[in-house]
């Protein structure tokens, strides 16, 4: 017996990816096969994982932010959604005609939004930083311009936002199989940080985690191995940083390192390697040796 079935498959965007006819040859007698072991399927509600962070802001006033060069869909929609959620008061800095063109194309409501018209991305970065320096906004958001373009204005000695502490970047990673958000630093600003730079990078990340509701962040200082090796600088830095934390030179967090990536985020891996640590397998913050390795992790 032959069965003919029309067959059509669409992808997540509703586009047809398979179209044809399936011919099935029906067996003439009953066939039994052993049950196959199926992989475990986990459904992760990504928005749910961030609700506790948003919940912390419910009684706070929205803060003014400058959005530098929001000239594509994502960088324009994001601050408008944050405005609608009562989180921010966006100030859009960029070519007004281009911003309005994107808004009209994508149905983004700009009513009541302040737009500062500047000719190009470099002027957007310069103006956004000036607004922050003058206290007109409390935060900066990068739009559709290169990170270097914005950061060159931020770190300018004359007109930037320098403080006594070194600037650093933190990724907030959504890992479905990890029980809480994971902060990764620094994978965007400091290319090859020194030991002194790493002190600032760690302190910045600890204070951010505390602001996010983590009372004593667990900080894993990553390297290729979990033992100190004089030929691997990152292991020496990790050991020194942990001792500096013991001496109060880094405050507010619980540090351990060097730790390889697997035993920083997996209790099973840490136990297998015989690592006894309050940080291993349950880190809140991953401190990477340099920008390259940080980008690979994040």
Report each predicted region and the residues it spans.
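Anion-binding alpha/beta catalytic cores of soluble intermediary-metabolism enzymes, centered on
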Residues: 43-91, 95-298
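HotDog/MaoC-like acyl-thioester-processing domains
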Residues: 2-45
């Amino acid at each position: 017996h032959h069965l003919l079935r029309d067959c059509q498959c669409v992808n997540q965007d509703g586009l047809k990816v398979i179209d044809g006819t399936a011919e099935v040859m029906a067996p003439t007698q009953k066939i039994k096969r052993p049950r196959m072991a199926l992989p475990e399927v986990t459904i992760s509600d990504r928005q749910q994982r961030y609700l506790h962070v948003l919940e912390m802001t419910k009684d706070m006033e929205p803060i003014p932010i400058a959005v530098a060069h929001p000239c594509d869909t994502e960088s324009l929609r994001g601050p408008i959604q944050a405005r609608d959620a009562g989180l921010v008061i966006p100030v859009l800095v960029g070519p007004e005609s281009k911003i309005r063109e994107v808004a009209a194309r994508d149905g983004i409501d700009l009513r009541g939004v302040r737009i500062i018209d500047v000719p190009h991305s470099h002027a957007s970065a310069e103006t956004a930083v000036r607004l922050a320096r003058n206290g007109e906004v409390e935060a900066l958001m990068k739009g559709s311009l290169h990170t270097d373009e914005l950061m060159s204005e931020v770190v300018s000695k004359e007109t930037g936002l320098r403080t006594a502490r070194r600037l650093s970047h933190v990724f907030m990673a959504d890992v479905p199989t990890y029980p809480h958000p994971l902060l990764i630093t620094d994978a965007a600003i400091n290319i090859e940080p020194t030991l002194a730079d790493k002190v600032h990078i760690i302190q910045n990340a600890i204070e951010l985690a505390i602001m996010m509701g983590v009372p004593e962040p667990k900080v894993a200082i990553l390297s290729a191995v979990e033992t100190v090796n004089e030929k691997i600088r990152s292991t020496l830095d990790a050991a020194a940083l942990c001792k500096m934390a013991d001496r109060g030179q880094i405050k507010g967090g619980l540090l351990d390192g060097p730790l390889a990536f697997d035993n920083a985020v997996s209790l099973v891996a840490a136990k297998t390697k015989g690592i006894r640590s309050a940080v291993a397998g349950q880190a809140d913050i991953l401190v990477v040796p340099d920008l390259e390795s940080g980008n690979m992790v994040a």
